[in-house]
Amino acid sequence: MFKLLLIEDDESLFHEIKDRLTGWSYDVYGIQDFSQVLQEFAAVNPDCVIIDVQLPKFDGFHWCRLIRSRSNVPILFLSSRDHPADMVMSMQLGADDFIQKPFHFDVLIAKIQAMFRRVHHYNTEPSTIKTWCGAAVDAEQNLVSNDKGSVELTKNEMFILKQLIEQKNKIVSREELIRSLWNDERFVSDNTLTVNVNRLRKKLDALQLGAYIETKVGQGYIAKEEDKFYD
């Protein structure tokens, strides 16, 4: 889970943004003492910073300058002022993006996701091949292979399988899968997820693996190991 440090002194707006971001599976931290922003930044060690221009004690530009001198963490500025100079200043200080208040929450999410794609390189792994139930799961080639043969998956099917394997023997909710797909810009609906899982299971049947992807009614899905079955 990515950690976000939200540096916003408007408590109402802070809690509104935090609640929405938490719903997208981000871990959101705030600032307790606005004279100690740098120390609190170091303590949290966030994956992303969202910072308002206007803050108590020192403005956001001051803290951006100090944070950027110590870290390459993505920084997104918020501002209620309609001043082009604010955007120019934020970029000159090393911020990655800027959004003016009031803003639509979907725009904020899109900007955060874009920063993570640029900086953290979504979906890059040291190895794209995993093993599961005696099969090789090649995420780069979208292939699953075992001694029964090989099947080719679509990108969405492979993405879903990877998410389930990474949490094997644990229930992954439908909501979590949909959020993950949206985070990766694979825009799917609830019905589309059902279709993809059913299609994935049918393809895995050719390798005698379909039964290892189990539906938990009202909860989600689970990728089981060969020796772990559930009632």
Swiss-Prot record:
User: 4-aspartylphosphate-modified residues are where?
Assistant: 52
**Upper classification of the organism:** Bacteria, Bacillati, Bacillota, Bacilli, Bacillales
Keywords of this entry: Cytoplasm, DNA-binding, Phosphoprotein, Transcription, Transcription regulation, Two-component regulatory system
* Pfam families noted in UniProt: Response_reg, Trans_reg_C
Gene3D superfamilies according to UniProt: 3.40.50.2300, Winged helix-like DNA-binding domain superfamily/Winged helix DNA-binding domain (1.10.10.10)
Record keywords: Zinc-finger included? no
Q: Domain (Response regulatory): give its ranges.
A: 3-116
This entry's Gene Ontology molecular function terms read: phosphorelay response regulator activity; transcription cis-regulatory region binding
Q: Which gene encodes it?
A: bceR
What is the name of the protein in this document? Answer: Sensory transduction protein BceR
| Species whose genome carries this gene | Bacillus subtilis (strain 168)
